[in-house]
């Protein structure tokens, strides 16, 4: 019986610890108004689960902030969009995550909404 409990405990620990916040490859839609079309590019971003809790009794002295899987370090890469008009700026700069962690959502650099547009949204259609 103790062996079964130990196995269950191990698998629960593994599910919590090993499925955490980590780098993952994603495809995003890139668009520029001057070019009037979208292309898909591959980049690296953060995804996974972070330990969080929602207290039953709220303490106004200690605000309850939910932690999300977000970037700790990032770099920017620039590409040239093919097929843009010659007079337009055809360069596009996008973020690439290099390190992730569980932290507070920074609304200055991240879409913190419950249901954002998503990485594949394109206002021009593909």
From Swiss-Prot:
It comes from the Eukaryota. Coiled coil: none annotated. The keyword Lipoprotein does not apply. Keywords: Disulfide bond, Glycoprotein, Hormone, Secreted, Signal. Residues 1-19 form the signal peptide. GO terms for molecular function: follicle-stimulating hormone activity. Pfam families: Cys_knot (PF00007). InterPro entries: Cystine-knot_cytokine (IPR029034), Glyco_hormone_CN (IPR006208), Gonadotropin_bsu (IPR001545), Gonadotropin_bsu_CS (IPR018245). It is found in: Secreted. Gene3D superfamilies: Cystine-knot cytokines. One of its GO terms (biological process) is G protein-coupled receptor signaling pathway. Glycans are attached at residues 25, 42. GO terms for cellular component: cytoplasm; extracellular space; follicle-stimulating hormone complex. Disulfide bonds join 21-69, 35-84, 38-122, 46-100, 50-102, 105-112. Belongs to the glycoprotein hormones subunit beta family. Together with the alpha chain CGA constitutes follitropin, the follicle-stimulating hormone, and provides its biological specificity to the hormone heterodimer. Binds FSHR, a G protein-coupled receptor, on target cells to activate downstream signaling pathways. Follitropin is involved in follicle development and spermatogenesis in reproductive organs. Heterodimer. The active follitropin is a heterodimer composed of an alpha chain/CGA shared with other hormones and a unique beta chain/FSHB shown here. This is Follitropin subunit beta. It comes from Phodopus sungorus (Striped hairy-footed hamster). The lineage of its organism: Eukaryota, Metazoa, Chordata, Craniata, Vertebrata.
């Amino acid at each position: 019986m103790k062996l079964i409990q130990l196995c269950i405990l191990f698998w629960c620990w593994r599910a919590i610890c090993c499925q955490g916040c980590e780098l993952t490859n994603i495809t995003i839609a890139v668009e520029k108004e001057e070019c009037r079309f979208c292309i898909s590019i591959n980049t690296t971003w953060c995804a996974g689960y972070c330990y969080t809790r929602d207290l039953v009794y709220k303490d106004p002295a200690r605000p309850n902030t939910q932690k999300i899987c977000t970037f700790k370090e990032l770099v920017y890469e620039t590409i040239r969009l093919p097929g843009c008009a010659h007079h337009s700026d055809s360069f596009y700069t996008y973020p690439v995550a290099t390190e992730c962690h569980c932290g507070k959502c920074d609304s200055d650099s991240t879409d913190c909404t419950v249901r954002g547009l998503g990485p594949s949204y394109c206002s021009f259609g593909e």
